[in-house]
Every structure is written in C-alpha cells, then in structure tokens.
C-alpha cells in the first residue's frame, strides 16, 4: 500500500466523517447516557467489515482489527460524551436535545476515529499486529468512563495507545505535541469545617467556621509557594467556599472544594498529607473539627519522550514531516488516556478543526468546524 493509495482512502472517507460528525453533533448525550451514540458507532463500525466488535460497558464500544501478520497492539481512543450546555446555534445540525451540546469536540473525535477505522479496515491485508479502536464514554465526569473500560480489559496486551483532541488555538494544518509530561493529574479535594453556629451579633458564643475556613484557604496557598521546589509544577486551587444562608447568622459549617494538579507521583501523594495537616492544625487551634477527603483522578498524560532511543518511530517521524508545533505543558485541562496508558506507552496529539477562526479557550458556543 503506497502513500498515494492511503491518501486516496483518506479523501474518500472525508465526506463520511463530516456526515457522521454532524449527526453526532445533532444528537448529543451526556456522560454515562451515550446509549444512542454508542449504538450509532457500533452500527457504523459494523458496516465496514473485518472488525471484531464488542461493548466493554453499557455505553462504550471497542472494535478490533486483527492484521494478517503478527506484530504490536496499538489502541486508538476517542471520547463520545457531550456537555450540559444549551446550544445557541441555528444551523441544521444544531443539537436537538435541549440543554445538551457537543461543545468540546467529542463529536469530531468520534467521527475521526470512525473514519480511521474505515480506512484501516480496507488496509487489513497490510497490517501487522492488531489495532483497537476505543470509543470511550463519560470522559467529562470525574473520574470518567476510562476506568470502567480498563477494568473490562480493553487495554490487555496493548503496547501503545494514541489519542487526539481538537484544539482551536492551533494554526490550521499543524499538529501540537509535547514530549514527556503534557497534562497533569486532575485530583480534587473536599473540606468541611465544623464549628458552632450562632447569632452574628454574638460571635463570642460561636465557633466561627467562616473565619476558620478563611484561614485554611490562605494557608493552603503556602503549599505551592513554600513547601515545594519552585521548579516543580504544582497547582492547588480553592474553587468553592460555601457557607451560611442569612446575613445575621454565623453558620456552623463551611464546605471548601478545589483541585490539585501534579505531574510527579510522589508529590501527588504528599500534597494531601500536607493539606490535612494544615486543616487539622487550624481547626484544633480554634476548637472546631473537620472532614477531609482527597479524590484521585486520572494519572498524568506523559507522552513517550522523544529523547528515548526507543521512541521516534515511523509514525512520529511522519507527524514531524507534516508539520508539528510545540505545545505548552498543561495542568490537566483535558482528562485523556491517563488510565488507558497506565500499562502502555502513549502519544497524545492536538490538531485544529476546520473552524473559520482561531479561538483561545474556553471555546465559544458556535461549533463552526467539520
């Protein structure tokens, strides 16, 4: 199979990919509810032939293409779920499901992987090893559907896993990549400060949970600035502080939530210990009590490093020839194949969709790409 023949197959599938993307965009489904989406993907894959299909979970799909010769096992993954956003567009393939929209490009990811599966199914005689096409459900919810799929065995025996995400800030025709650490582990924390409520005019009869919570928030910031080497990437953000229902009443409790982003596994396991030590010390000093919970999300995305002598195969060299641009390392804006890649090498790319303008994130509501 020559490059010209492959290009011909790519050109031939282009119309299908656009049609699939528009169908998916018009019929978005939320995380763990992707039943019609999964059925559409399954039936579309079934029409290609040569693929062994399965449903690892209720709303996910896996297709296996077994080559004619032995070789490595490569997995390619796309996400399928939409977001709880009301679409404001008026074009014919705008969302038909009120309050649900493909606002993050998962319709495009799914359509592209369908197109990839169709092309490879026509190249079966030239394939060595196995290709697994993984259509993941529930990427948007914490900790996501990847864990269920891994537990179902979709990654058993996989050597390399590949994924991509549409990224509007990129120039058209460019592929963005970071070798080594690319996206951080997105963990979250929950803190409840339990004091003693009372009238706002008699604070001496209370244990002021708001004042205690404010001290906790302030002191948590010292973890990044004073506990960790300045060259070590770490983000700790308090994103919610909930307390009280009346202007003249001091509440008995405060709830604090937020996120922690890390690349280093040792630091990742140490940060919650530091956090709880701070919370414990402050609450005990003021006669309050606390609850602390730290939920671990996906592992960090660490692309197989280009400096590794085992890396830099034909696929990566082809990407470079086509035109790739560096991306800044990110603290986990996207939750990708961290669980999928736990036991396999990974390569995660970004590419721009065919949108009319380059946008900085967060992306605007219009989904102007195909």
Swiss-Prot record:
Give the cofactors, semicolon-separated.
Answer: Co(2+)
Q: Name one GO molecular function term.
A: aminoacylase activity
Classification via Pfam families: M20_dimer, Peptidase_M20
Which Gene3D superfamilies does this UniProt record tie to the protein? Answer: 3.30.70.360, Zn peptidases (3.40.630.10)
Q: NCBIfam families per the record? A: amidohydrolases (TIGR01891)
Q: How does it assemble?
A: Homotetramer.
Official protein name in the record: N-acyl-L-amino acid amidohydrolase
Give the organism, scientific name: Geobacillus stearothermophilus (Bacillus stearothermophilus)
What gene does this protein come from? amaA
